[in-house]
């Protein structure tokens, strides 16, 4: 008797419904955004040190300047202990602050800035040049940040200059706080007088790199340190910064060391942010400028 043939019935696979596909796609997107957010948060709390070597025949021995900019009330550790420790380990001769350590939107909230300045001043003399957030808080919201920092024996500049001697080298520290658009009317006389006073090494502290888009390039500035541009906020591979205040898209001057005309200047990427757009691929930066004759 022949064996009976058996027929195998193959059931068609059920197609995944649109709803399930959508849920999976959304879950992947949420997971991706979550990972990206964690990476951004991690990056924005990692301090990066950027070293620059500047040569000058006006100095006797090596001078180290540590520069900070654009903290905008961000704290690295309790009472900025991580930031202070990093600066201390760098053994600076002076600490230069080039503005926007506060937030103009919180005109009376700057106790952390004063605390940081006091801690840094125990490491090395602090020289603080006002930025637009300090100026705007003072002019339009009656902030006492300038007076209160000055009361703590911190040298804070508002279109002022001071000569210091470091290891036998005389340095004229010039704090230019005027916005570049108002320079000709309110800042030029002060600046030119400070520049022509003597043949000392000229260290310019100003918040605005835009000064070097035409206004100050022909002056013999031995070194200027600026901030304001936040490194372009979002840094694109092979391109650089995406956007900076007062420069717009793809800013020319948002980070790094530059020589243009007779001037040498550094643009700090800064430490914090002032708006809702996060810093992306743009770690907070401590600038170290080593000035030497060799």
Sequence positions of predicted segments:
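Membrane-embedded segments
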Residues: 62-157
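Mobile, glycine- and charge-enriched loop segments
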Residues: 47-77, 186-209
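Short, Asp-centered acidic motifs that coordinate Mg2+ and/or phosphate
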Residues: 93-94, 127, 154-155, 171, ...
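Active-site metal-binding loops of divalent metal-dependent hydrolases
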Residues: 68-73, 99-101, 132-134, 160-161, ...
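Binuclear metal-dependent hydrolase catalytic cores centered on His/Asp/Glu-rich metal-binding motifs
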Residues: 138, 143-154, 166-206, 210-214, ...
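Conserved beta-sheet core of the metallophosphoesterase superfamily
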Residues: 209-287, 294
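Beta-strand-turn-beta hairpins that frame and shape the catalytic cleft
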Residues: 53-66, 154, 161-174, 197-201, ...
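N-terminal membrane-anchoring alpha-helices
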Residues: 2-59
């Amino acid at each position: 008797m022949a064996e009976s043939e058996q027929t195998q019935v193959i059931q068609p696979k059920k197609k995944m419904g649109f709803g399930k596909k959508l849920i999976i796609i959304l879950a992947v997107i949420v997971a991706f955004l979550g990972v990206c957010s964690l990476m951004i948060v991690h990056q924005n709390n990692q301090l990066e040190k950027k070293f620059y070597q500047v040569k000058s025949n006006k100095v006797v021995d090596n001078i180290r300047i540590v520069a900070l900019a654009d903290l905008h009330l961000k704290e690295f550790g309790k009472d900025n202990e991580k930031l202070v420790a990093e600066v201390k380990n760098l053994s600076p001769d002076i600490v230069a602050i080039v503005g926007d350590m506060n937030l103009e939107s919180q005109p009376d909230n700057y106790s952390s800035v004063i605390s940081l300045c006091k801690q840094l001043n125990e490491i090395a003399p602090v020289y603080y040049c006002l930025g637009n957030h300090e100026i705007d808080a003072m002019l339009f919201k009656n902030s006492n940040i300038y007076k209160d920092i000055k009361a703590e024996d911190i040298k804070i500049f508002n279109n002022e200059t001071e000569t210091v001697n470091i290891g036998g080298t005389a340095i004229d520290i010039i704090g230019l706080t005027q916005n570049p658009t108002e320079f000709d009317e309110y800042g030029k006389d002060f600046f030119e007088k400070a520049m022509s006073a003597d043949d000392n090494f000229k260290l310019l502290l100003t918040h605005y790199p835009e000064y070097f888009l035409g206004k100050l390039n022909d002056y013999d500035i031995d070194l200027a340190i600026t901030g304001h541009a936040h490194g372009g906020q979002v840094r694109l591979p092979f391109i650089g910064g995406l956007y900076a205040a007062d420069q717009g898209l793809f800013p020319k001057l948002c980070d790094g060391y530059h020589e243009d005309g007779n001037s040498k200047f550094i643009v700090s990427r800064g430490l914090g942010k002032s708006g809702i757009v996060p810093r992306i691929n743009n770690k907070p930066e401590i600038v170290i400028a080593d000035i030497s004759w060799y």
